[in-house]
């Protein structure tokens, strides 16, 4: 098994059969995790990156059964942060040392492209040294492009089943 781990580490490629052997077989966990840790350190180092998550809304048009903010959950106390509330969270986060803000929420039609782009621009204008990540569910390609043009740095699109 160490031979497969070593080959995966050095060549970064195994056949499907070899991967299945590795996943399903008996192996030295300490050796495997040590190799994985070397790869992690090589590409990501040992730094810790803090991100300020701002849950902007728990309204969602979807009804995913596993999700607490699903449309049909009548026990959820719904909220939607105003633009001023969101910008205030960024102010507080900046004071605390955060340099990435993640605006996250359900698929809430209230937050149109115009509203999001205006907020992104305000955040980037006030805090040009900060990154803005969005996680607001599925949107159109045009919507993603508009938000990127407004200054968004990343979009976290979750695909859960």
Labelled PLM ranges:
Residues 17, 24-25, 34, 45-47, ...:
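Residue-identity detector for glycine
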Residues 1-62:
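Flexible, acidic/Gly-rich N-terminal and inter-domain linker regions that tether
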């Amino acid at each position: 098994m160490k031979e497969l781990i070593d080959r995966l580490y050095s060549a970064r490629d195994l056949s499907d059969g070899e991967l299945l052997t590795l996943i399903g077989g008996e192996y030295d966990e300490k050796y495997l995790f040590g190799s994985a840790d070397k790869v992690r350190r090589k590409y990501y180092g040992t730094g810790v990156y803090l991100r300020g998550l701002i849950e902007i809304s728990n309204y969602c048009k979807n009804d995913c059964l596993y999700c607490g903010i699903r449309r049909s959950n009548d026990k959820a106390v719904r909220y939607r942060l105003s633009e001023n509330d969101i910008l205030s969270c960024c102010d507080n986060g900046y004071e605390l040392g955060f340099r990435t803000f993640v605006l996250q929420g359900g698929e809430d039609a209230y937050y149109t492209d115009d509203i999001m782009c205006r907020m992104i621009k305000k955040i980037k204008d006030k805090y040009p040294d900060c990154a803005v990540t969005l996680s607001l569910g599925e949107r159109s390609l045009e919507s993603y492009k508009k938000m990127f043009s407004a200054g968004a740095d990343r979009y976290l699109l979750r695909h859960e089943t």
